[in-house]
């Protein structure tokens, strides 16, 4: 992987990630394909929304179908027939989401398989091996996603262990002869001094890109913005910056304003299945009765298949009847909305008009522009 930085506007960056499997224009949003599919979508449909890279879930694909089935096909690209690059998370977040059925040690994490209850162990080395078999174009280190809230002492211990795991991840990645990219993950909760230690330690190990982890886990938005403002300038400028698990459209806008290049989140697909649809002027809850006889498109400014062909009334009807097509059409729209938003941000950065774009984005939704505390 090669990262090319074209231009900046304030702290916002316009560039691209170059892979053997294709080019990803940044800032970029990655749809989430947890089980080897972006829910309800064919790879061709995902590509048609403008997505150039997707995310796969190491933890879930390891448990089912497993490494051996994956290797029978070649790798995850061959298994799911996605031709572009794939980033896989390390499995850490899912393991730590298991709560009481997992035990963290210096060696790794002991837990019970949520499918059948069998005892399982996952550590940095195993995570690197699974992601190698998946053929991931971007591999994420195995870390502990520090929960929120966490006091300073716990966050410090967690961050320090994640640094040790980062070195173990790097060593195993290299010993496998993996020629793809490996990203480090910055931890430290909402504490700037701990984030400083994490960034410094990861940069000393050396990675192809750096993710900001442990945000969007329940902390106030002001804390997320503050940490991004503090951390991003410390990440080497020639490396991509990835904000994990984020987020709402406004979170993408605020991340880009602070220097983030990559995002992923289940929100556009999950919300689509629940009838929450993102449009230029905010959010449409399509199951509300007021849409029953509305013959207008979901978003007059959207060029997606759904908006070009169907009315709000039809989407409302499909939702009320619990038709699978409704979830699919909603997903096509939400994914396209996110990709149109990213394309708009990229164009605004190129033209040096990012703040004008941001102002219009919020004005259309009747909301104030959040403060930006950067030099």
Swiss-Prot record:
Gene3D superfamilies: Queuine tRNA-ribosyltransferase-like (3.20.20.105). It is an enzyme of class 2 (transferase). Residues 245-251, 269-273 are annotated as: RNA binding. It catalyses: 7-aminomethyl-7-carbaguanine + guanosine(34) in tRNA = 7-aminomethyl-7-carbaguanosine(34) in tRNA + guanine. GO terms for biological process: queuosine biosynthetic process; tRNA wobble guanine modification; tRNA-guanine transglycosylation. It comes from the Bacteria. The keyword Glycosyltransferase applies. GO terms for molecular function: metal ion binding; tRNA-guanosine(34) queuine transglycosylase activity. Catalyzes the base-exchange of a guanine (G) residue with the queuine precursor 7-aminomethyl-7-deazaguanine (PreQ1) at position 34 (anticodon wobble position) in tRNAs with GU(N) anticodons (tRNA-Asp, -Asn, -His and -Tyr). Catalysis occurs through a double-displacement mechanism. The nucleophile active site attacks the C1' of nucleotide 34 to detach the guanine base from the RNA, forming a covalent enzyme-RNA intermediate. The proton acceptor active site deprotonates the incoming PreQ1, allowing a nucleophilic attack on the C1' of the ribose to form the product. Belongs to the queuine tRNA-ribosyltransferase family. Homodimer. Within each dimer, one monomer is responsible for RNA recognition and catalysis, while the other monomer binds to the replacement base PreQ1. This is Queuine tRNA-ribosyltransferase. It comes from Salmonella typhimurium (strain LT2 / SGSC1412 / ATCC 700720).
